[in-house]
Amino acid sequence: CRELEARVELTQNAFTKLWDPQHEHFYNRDEFTGELIRVPTSACFLPLFAGLAGNEQVLKMVSTLENWMDQKFLLVPSTAPHEPSYEPERYWRGPVWPHINWMICEGLSDYGFDDLSRKIRMQTLELISKLGFYEYYHPLGESGLGGSSFSWTAAVCLIWDNSTNTR
């Protein structure tokens, strides 16, 4: 039990080192330099899923998601639309990934942001319904990308279909 508690504490401490109070984002960290990689990505929202974000951090993440939504992008692009490295069809540089959206939606609901979670879920399901079970999608809903019969996309649909009555 103590070993497990120590691992949990290590994980919590690691997450606190990923928060950048100046930019109000969780960021990835370069393993070699130790520097934060200050590019907002969909990974910035995964602390919601882990349950490791504080209340102020959650509010900042929700604000960021709403800002991205106001820019007419379907959520959640894998790289922030305003970033120079954003490319809507390039692997992990802009497309929407259903399994990442599922984790973000779960986290949003866990923190009480059911309306935003529902919006993201519905946008994602509409993309899948319109375009098919692709690996990932153009963030403006223009096309499905990558593999065209992707099991994790189907799994996300099944999970959301089975949880409709519980959320």
Regions found by a protein language model. Name each.
Residues C1-E3, Y111:
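Inter-helical turn/loop segments and adjacent helix faces that build the functional surface
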Residues A43-G54, N101-D114:
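Alpha-helical support elements that line or immediately flank enzyme active sites
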Residues R118-T124:
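Hydrophobic transmembrane alpha-helices and their immediate junctions
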Residues Q12-V96, Q123, S129-R167:
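Extended glycan-interaction surfaces of carbohydrate-active proteins
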Residues A6, V96-H99:
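Short acidic alpha-helix initiation/capping motifs at coil-to-helix transition points
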